[in-house]
């Protein structure tokens, strides 16, 4: 029974850590973090209360490891570089210089997966970290994801509308291809040579002579020499064609 009572605090620390450790401070203060109930601490882990204030994502991240040389190993990209140091040869007790955004829970992990936790509240973080315009570009992912989602929804809606209209409209008949008449090569027509009109009275073309009807009375009568006026005498006409 006495052994069980001695092991009870260790079992509770493994199950839920050290629930009584809580620290408050202002930016610029120095606070001490200690491992309570952990026999062989090997690393420290930090879960920020306002990760956007530091440009981080939610979740735990390691901030310190124990090493065989006695000098703790600090990750190069952790937010406590230059402000966190060990107070003993191990990593059981740490000193932290507070800064805005350091609020969160610090976990001290043991070799047998036991842990203790210390909750840190930095005064002013609730107001400072919720102010508009957080640093380190943390606002961009928060705006980019909704915009991408809205664009995806609009694109899918447009595709659905086009598909629905395409199904409702009757299919259009296929127009026949235009037909072209074969090209026939025609020879140019030669100009018709006009015949020259015949000139009446051309004796060379028409050797025959046609005589008009003569005055038979004048021909049947012998011509008399008369002293009468020549105008009174009968006239003989000849028509040459």
From Swiss-Prot:
Glycosylation sites (chain numbering): 32
InterPro entries: G6B, G6B_V-set
Extracellular topological intervals: 18-142
Motif (ITIM motif): 209-214, 235-240
Cleavable signal peptide: 1-17
Modification(s) after translation: All isoforms are N-glycosylated. Isoform E is O-glycosylated.
GO biological process, one term: blood coagulation
Cytoplasmic compartment residues: 164-241
Keywords: Cell membrane, Endoplasmic reticulum, Glycoprotein, Golgi apparatus, Heparin-binding, Membrane, Phosphoprotein, Receptor, Signal, Transmembrane, Transmembrane helix
GO function term, MF aspect, one: heparin binding
Residues that span the membrane, as ranges: 143-163
Superkingdom of this protein's organism: Eukaryota
Modified-residue entries (Phosphotyrosine), positions: 211
Pfam families referenced in this protein's UniProt entry, alphabetically: G6B
Presence of the UniProt keyword Glycoprotein in the record: yes
Expressing tissues: Expressed in platelets. Not detected in the monocyte-like cell line U-937, the B-cell-like cell line Raji, the fibroblast cell lines TK and HeLa, or the natural killer cell lines NKL, NK 62 and YT.
One Gene Ontology term, aspect cellular component: Golgi apparatus
Pathology linked to this chain's protein: Thrombocytopenia, anemia, and myelofibrosis: An autosomal recessive disorder characterized by thrombocytopenia, increased number of giant platelets, and anemia manifesting in early childhood. Bone marrow biopsy shows increased number of megakaryocytes and reticular fibrosis consistent with myelofibrosis.
Role this protein plays: Inhibitory receptor that acts as a critical regulator of hematopoietic lineage differentiation, megakaryocyte function and platelet production. Inhibits platelet aggregation and activation by agonists such as ADP and collagen-related peptide. This regulation of megakaryocate function as well as platelet production ann activation is done through the inhibition (via the 2 ITIM motifs) of the receptors CLEC1B and GP6:FcRgamma signaling. Appears to operate in a calcium-independent manner.
Quaternary structure and interacting proteins, as annotated: Interacts (via ITIM motif) with PTPN6 and PTPN11. Binds to heparin.
Swiss-Prot/TrEMBL domain comment: Isoform B, displayed in this entry, is the only one of the isoforms to contain both a transmembrane region and 2 copies of a cytoplasmic motif that is referred to as the immunoreceptor tyrosine-based inhibitor motif (ITIM). This motif is involved in modulation of cellular responses. The phosphorylated ITIM motif can bind the SH2 domain of several SH2-containing phosphatases. The 2 ITIM motifs of isoform B are required for the inhibition of CLEC1B and GP6:FCER1G signaling and platelet activation.
UniProt-recorded name of the protein: Megakaryocyte and platelet inhibitory receptor G6b
Gene: MPIG6B
